[in-house]
């Protein structure tokens, strides 16, 4: 089956094994990247495929996979520091919402002079952003294309919403084969959450013919898969 490519901002690629061609896709934004990688992807072999694709295309990269279950501002500060020291051209985030969230913050604040906590306290970033390429392992990140992202403040352990610039994510690659890293219970949970998102999209006041068509098809496919589970 051919890939389904959306020519919008950000660009979206849907297709089996599309993640294995990430080395081809990212060359538009540079040749030196920081790869944020969910550590669980080492076990499923997904990380090896990502690294091989980048290597085959002569893309220079380094891996940051020190990502706990609930990453906070300390983890993000560490990732941001490494990114600045490496003078990268862009960021590739491969994993679930927590990994993509770190990627959004690092891409947003890469060119900022002020530190992360200044923005956690309410300031809005104004500098340019670093190109961000996301490879979500699930389709449930509601902040993926938004101008904000949740982050735990390590000082108070409170969850805060960090304001970001618009259009940080330049490309999102959705590869259904990446779901092999999920357990059966996780697949069921993600399916129900995705169904709720499709329903919310359908009844939204901002919906249109195109979004309704996608939402209807999504609900049909999800319900069908749940019936067969």
Locate predicted features.
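Conserved strand-to-helix beginnings and helix N-cap segments that scaffold or border functional pockets
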Residues: 47-48, 73-76, 103, 144-145, ...
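ATP/NTP phosphate-donor binding region
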Residues: 1-90
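Short Gly/Thr/Asp-enriched flexible loops that form oxyanion-binding sites at enzyme active sites
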Residues: 50, 80, 99-113, 145-148
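A glycine/threonine-rich phosphate-anchoring loop and its flanking beta-alpha core
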Residues: 10, 111-210, 218
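A conserved active-site cap/scaffold subdomain adjacent to cofactor or substrate pockets
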Residues: 215-229
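Glycine/serine-rich anion-binding loops at beta->alpha junctions
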Residues: 87-104, 137-143
């Amino acid at each position: 089956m051919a890939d389904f490519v959306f020519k919008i901002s950000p660009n979206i690629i849907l297709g089996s094994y599309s993640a294995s061609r990430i080395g081809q896709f990212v060359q538009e934004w540079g040749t030196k990247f920081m790869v944020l990688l969910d550590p669980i992807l080492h076990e499923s072999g997904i990380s090896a495929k990502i690294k091989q694709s980048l290597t085959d295309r002569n893309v220079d990269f380094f891996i940051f996979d020190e990502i706990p279950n609930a990453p906070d501002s300390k983890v993000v500060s560490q990732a941001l520091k490494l990114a600045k020291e490496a003078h990268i051209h862009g960021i590739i985030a491969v994993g679930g919402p927590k990994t993509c969230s770190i990627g959004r913050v690092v891409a947003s604040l890469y060119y900022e002079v002020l530190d992360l906590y200044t923005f956690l306290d309410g300031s809005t970033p104004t500098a340019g952003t670093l190109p961000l390429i996301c490879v979500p392992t699930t389709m449930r990140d509601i902040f993926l294309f938004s101008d904000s992202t949740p982050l735990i403040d390590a000082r108070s352990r409170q969850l805060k919403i960090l304001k970001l610039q618009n259009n940080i994510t330049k490309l999102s690659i959705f590869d259904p084969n990446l779901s092999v890293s999920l357990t059966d219970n996780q697949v069921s949970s993600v399916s129900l959450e995705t169904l709720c998102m499709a329903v919310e999209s359908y009844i939204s006041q901002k919906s249109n013919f195109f979004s309704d068509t996608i939402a209807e098809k999504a609900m049909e496919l999800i319900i069908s898969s749940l019936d067969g589970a």
